[in-house]
């Protein structure tokens, strides 16, 4: 059985998709910056709220002691590596190509924040009365979901090779 080439292995659809996600990410972050109070929980539904904060580091505020330019260069190097992996991926691995698009969109979304604000805008908070998860943003979610799609593709490849 032949599988068709993945939509997002083609440059134009991939770039348009990434740009659309970047515009959405930046529009939300701008709205958060101008509308939400700093460090005040705005409940959305039980266990989910908006909570505006600034992240000077990377995931979970790690490396916040480093100069902003070091973090930007590090992120650009990671994006370059992800782009290289993407180009090495077989054209019929649809989930992997989608995953790489999501990761690159998310990474660039946070890099743009660094240049625009000097920090990354975080605003999504999962919580209960006694517990809360780290505050994150759409770009972080795109990176995580993208990694999930790449892992899914690897599992499917493994399953196909055994079948």
Swiss-Prot record:
The active site is at residues 122, 140. One of its GO terms (cellular component) is plasma membrane. The chain crosses the membrane at residues 4-24, 66-86, 92-112, 132-152. Pathway: Protein modification; lipoprotein biosynthesis (signal peptide cleavage). It catalyses: Release of signal peptides from bacterial membrane prolipoproteins. Hydrolyzes -Xaa-Yaa-Zaa-|-(S,diacylglyceryl)Cys-, in which Xaa is hydrophobic (preferably Leu), and Yaa (Ala or Ser) and Zaa (Gly or Ala) have small, neutral side chains. One of its GO terms (biological process) is proteolysis. The keyword rRNA-binding does not apply. GO terms for molecular function: aspartic-type endopeptidase activity. Keywords: Aspartyl protease, Cell inner membrane, Cell membrane, Hydrolase, Membrane, Protease, Transmembrane, Transmembrane helix. It is an enzyme of class 3 (hydrolase). Its EC number is 3.4.23.36. It is a multi-pass membrane protein. It is found in: Cell inner membrane. PROSITE patterns: SPASE_II. Belongs to the peptidase A8 family. This protein specifically catalyzes the removal of signal peptides from prolipoproteins. HAMAP family: LspA. NCBIfam families: lspA. This is Lipoprotein signal peptidase.
């Amino acid at each position: 059985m032949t599988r068709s080439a993945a939509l997002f292995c083609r440059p134009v659809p991939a770039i348009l998709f990434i740009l659309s996600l970047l515009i959405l990410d930046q529009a939300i972050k701008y709205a958060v910056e101008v509308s939400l109070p700093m460090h005040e929980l705005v409940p959305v539904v039980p266990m989910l709220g908006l909570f505006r904060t600034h992240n000077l580091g990377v995931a979970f505020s790690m490396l916040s002691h480093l100069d902003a330019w070091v973090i930007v260069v590090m992120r650009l190097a990671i994006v370059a590596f992800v782009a290289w992996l993407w180009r090495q991926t077989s054209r019929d691995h649809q989930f992997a190509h989608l995953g790489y698009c999501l990761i690159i969109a998310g990474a660039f979304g946070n890099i743009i924040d660094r240049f625009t604000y000097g920090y990354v805008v975080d605003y999504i908070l999962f919580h209960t009365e006694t517990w809360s998860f780290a505050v994150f943003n759409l770009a972080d979610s795109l990176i995580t979901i993208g990694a999930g799609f790449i892992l899914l593709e690897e599992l499917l490849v493994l399953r196909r090779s055994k079948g």
